């Protein structure tokens, strides 16, 4: 149940979400993606991993998860970037160029990761049973639908709304598979969900863009 809940509630915001949003909306969407990532990964580290651990070892929240979250390189990078933006500090052009080159690696790395996950599972082993169908329903219909409704209620429009809806329609976060293996939960179910949702994402997003 813990693995199922994590698969339904959190998405792959960076490895798939960032390159997807960048291609769709341009680099101006990056701050919105990073903000979503910060909230998304906070939920993963502080709630999602506890659910998976509860489903596997029978444990729950561990204080070490907070330390792990705060020392994650991506989280540190996001927090530092917020400080730079609010203080108006400009980094040297050479360093900015280096960061841009590193950013350009995200898309090919995401494709490699996606291919590796699908290869590890094997297309013949991908079976859409009832539980996985429910995950797909949450991942690509209910969660984006709720996000759209919340945007309407709170008056969120424009690029911010588009990024939020696309990000919530991203595949199952691959960390679910890693956590399931680490804590003795249903790793096969998590891996199949990650692979199927990644494949489905490339069909769902074009349809979603027509609606947006």
Show which residues each predicted segment covers.
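Alpha-helical transmembrane segments of multi-pass small-molecule/ion transporters
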Residues: 1-212
